[in-house]
Amino acid sequence: MYLLGHIIGWLWLMLTVAIGLSRHSVKSANRFLILSRIGYLLIIITGVALAIRTLSGNWWLTLLKVILGLGTIGLIEVAFARKQESHLNSGLVTLLVCGTLLTIICGIGLHWQLTGNLI
């Protein structure tokens, strides 16, 4: 149940961030920033519940996933702040995409190692 909520939260976050950062209007981007923060809440709540359950199985990969997840959320906040100032550059977007992909790969790896199932 927590895993499904966590995945839905990440999908919601990726959707709102992609749409929000592609908006030309700052006001429109701010709406998606607020919507993305709803995703943060879901991700953090389900992430804590999942981390408690996976910490005994693989503590170092769980810790890495937590650090990558929080770092990705931080990069999203920085990207939206730069968008509001009209200073969003491609380097930051590339870093955000790479951070998100690393977080997803780490999460899939953690799930695979603990359950033996890829998905």
From Swiss-Prot:
Its main location: membrane. It is a multi-pass membrane protein. One of its GO terms (cellular component) is plasma membrane. The chain crosses the membrane at residues 1-21, 32-52, 60-80, 92-112. The keyword Acyltransferase does not apply. It comes from the Bacteria. The keyword Transmembrane applies. InterPro entries: UPF0344. It is found in: Cell membrane. Keywords: Cell membrane, Membrane, Transmembrane, Transmembrane helix. NCBIfam families: PRK13673.1-6 (NF010199). Belongs to the UPF0344 family. HAMAP family: UPF0344 (MF_01536). This is UPF0344 protein lp_1373. It comes from Lactiplantibacillus plantarum (strain ATCC BAA-793 / NCIMB 8826 / WCFS1) (Lactobacillus plantarum).
